[in-house]
Structure formats: C-alpha cells, structure tokens
Amino acid sequence: MTKNIKTIPTSDYEEIIATVQHYVDGLRVGKSADVAKAFNKDAVMYGFTNGKLLGGPIKNLYDFVDENGTAPEIKVRLDILGITPTTAVVRVDMEKDAIGADYTDLHTLIKMDGKWQIIAKVYHMYEG
C-alpha cells in the first residue's frame, strides 16, 4: 500500500486566510499601506469596473483605496478554492466596499520565503 501523506498543514490554510484578511482589513479602514501587506510588490490586478476593463499593477488598487477611503460596512466571505504546498487561490465575496459596490475577487497566492503573498487579483464588479 502506498503512503497517504498530508502535504498541506492546517497552518497554511490559516496563514492564507490571514494574508487575505490584511486586504479586507485595509479596505475597511481605508489604508492602502494595510492593504499592501497582503500583496507581493509586483502583483497585478485585472477586472471590469462599470463595464470597462481595468488592469495593470496593484498600485491601481492602492490608488482606489486612497481616493475612496473607508468601508466600515464591508462584509466578506473568504473561501480557499485550491491549495498546493506553494500556491493557493482564494475567492473573496464582498459587499459594500468604500463606494458601496459589491465584488467577487479571485486572488492567486504564492508562498515565497515561508510567507504567503497575493500575486494576482482578478475581480468582477456587480451593478447596482
């Protein structure tokens, strides 16, 4: 019989959620520096805002946070959709950001030097 070895420790799940929670907490208080704690310095983001494609460096997100301020009523659900020893994908279901909009984000994370970081964010903004 082959060995059945658990390759992903529970602590990785906790660290991944904690990483994405930095993003959420930064949005709540309206501080891009707090949001940035979740992201790799070279991270990118792409998605549709009001029907127009927005894409490029994660600085676009930081600018949005700086321009629009706090999101005290933000509500989120975080789900790890996939995980390997060095990669993960997290879905962020979000309601009421700083401009009152709702989104679904998919964040791709990588574990480098023992630390989980978001390297890509793709999102869908809902109308209404």
Task: Give, region by region, the residue ranges found by the protein language model.
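Short beta-strand edge/turn micro-motifs at domain boundaries
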Residues: 102-128
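Short beta-strand segments enriched in hydrophobic/aromatic residues
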Residues: 39, 94-96, 122-123
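Residue-level signal for short amphipathic helical patches enriched in basic/charged
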Residues: 30, 97, 113
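Surface-exposed, charged secondary-structure patches
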Residues: 15, 44-49, 55-102
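Terminal "cap-and-tail" regions of soluble proteins that handle hydrophobic small molecules
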Residues: 2-4, 56, 117
